[in-house]
Curated annotation (Swiss-Prot):
UniProt-annotated catalytic positions: 211
Reactions this protein catalyses: a 1,2-diacyl-sn-glycero-3-phospho-L-serine + H(+) = a 1,2-diacyl-sn-glycero-3-phosphoethanolamine + CO2
Organism from which the protein derives: Novosphingobium aromaticivorans (strain ATCC 700278 / DSM 12444 / CCUG 56034 / CIP 105152 / NBRC 16084 / F199)
Lineage: Bacteria, Pseudomonadati, Pseudomonadota, Alphaproteobacteria, Sphingomonadales
Gene: psd
Quaternary structure, from the entry: Heterodimer of a large membrane-associated beta subunit and a small pyruvoyl-containing alpha subunit.
Pfam families: PS_Dcarbxylase (PF02666)
This protein's name: Phosphatidylserine decarboxylase proenzyme
Length: 252
C-alpha cells in the first residue's frame, strides 16, 4: 500500500508506507492520450518502426507528468524544496525586482538587499510538479516572457521565460521563488493566483519538459543543502528560518 494523500505519518511509526504507481497530473493526460492514440494507429497499420517509438514516447510523457504523493514535514521553521532536482547554484543576490518593487497593489514586496538564492535544476527525468516551500498567502504571481536558454546558466534567471511567486506567512516572513523555463520547456503552468492561501508542500504549478526553480531565502537564513545534492519537492528541508549553519560535504 502506498502513501495516501492527507494521511499523517511520523518518525514513531504512525502511518502506512509502500510503493505504488504515482498518479498522472491532468496536464499530462492529454499529451499521453495523443501519443497513445498515435502509437495504436501506427500499430494497426503495421508500421512497427513508427509504433514502437511512439509507444516509448507515450511512456515517457506519462512518466514526465507523474505526480507522486509526498510526505511534507510539518514544522514552521522549515523551508522545503519546491522542486525535484539538483542543487546547481547557491549565491548571494538581490531578489528579482518583480518581487521587490511596488506593484501598485498595496502588497508589501521583498527587501531588495541581497539574500541567498538556491537554484534547483530539473532534468527531463525529474518530477516537474512544483510545490510551495512554506505555508502562507500567495502575495504575487508574476509571469515574464523571455528566452529559452539552458536553465543551468546563471543568466537564465534574468533572460528566460519565468514566473515569480511571493509567499508570506502569517508572521510576515516572506519567501520568493521562481519557475524558469529551459531549452525544452515552453510552457509554465500555475495552479494558484494572488490571494490564495497555500499549505507547505502544496502543488502550485509545473513547467513542461526540463527547467529550473530558484528559491530566495529570508535574510539571515542559509541553506541546509549542499551544491550537487539531490532534493525532492515537498520533502527535502532546504533551510530553517533564521538558521545559518556552515555545512560541508564530500562527493563519493
Amino acid at each position: 500500500m502506498g502513501r495516501m494523500s492527507g494521511e499523517i505519518l511520523d518518525n514513531r511509526g504512525r502511518g502506512t508506507a509502500g510503493w505504488s504507481w504515482p498518479s498522472i497530473h491532468p496536464e499530462g493526460r492529454k499529451f499521453g492520450l495523443i501519443a497513445a492514440v498515435a502509437s495504436l494507429g501506427a500499430a494497426l497499420m503495421a508500421w512497427e518502426t513508427i509504433a514502437w517509438p511512439l509507444a516509448f514516447l507515450t511512456l515517457g510523457v506519462l512518466a514526465f507528468f507523474r505526480d507522486p504523493v509526498r510526505v511534507t514535514p510539518r514544522d514552521d521553521r522549515f523551508v522545503v524544496s519546491p522542486a525535484d532536482g539538483l542543487i546547481t547554484l547557491i549565491q548571494k543576490v538581490p531578489p528579482p525586482r518583480e518581487l521587490c518593487a511596488d506593484d501598485g497593489s498595496g502588497v508589501r514586496g521583498m527587501n531588495d538587499a541581497p539574500v541567498t538564492r538556491v537554484s534547483i535544476f530539473m532534468s527531463v527525468f525529474d518530477v516537474h510538479i512544483n510545490r510551495s516551500p512554506i505555508a502562507g498567502t500567495i502575495r504575487r504571481v508574476v509571469y515574464i516572457p523571455g528566452k529559452f536558454l539552458n536553465a543551468d546558466l546563471d543568466k537564465a534567471s534574468e533572460e528566460n521565460e519565468r514566473q515569480h511567486f511571493l509567499v508570506e506567512r502569517a508572521d510576515g516572513v516572506q519567501i520568493g521563488f521562481t519557475q524558469i523555463a529551459g531549452l525544452i520547456a515552453r510552457r509554465i503552468v500555475p495552479f494558484v493566483k494572488g490571494g490564495d492561501i497555500v499549505a507547505v508542500g502544496q502543488r502550485v504549478g509545473l513547467i513542461r519538459f526540463g527547467s529550473r526553480v530558484d528559491v530566495y531565502l529570508p535574510a539571515g537564513t542559509e541553506p541546509k543543502v549542499l551544491m550537487g545534492q539531490k532534493v525532492i519537492a515537498g520533502e527535502t528541508v532546504l533551510a530553517e528560518i533564521g538558521e545559518a549553519p556552515m555545512i560541508e560535504g564530500i562527493g563519493q
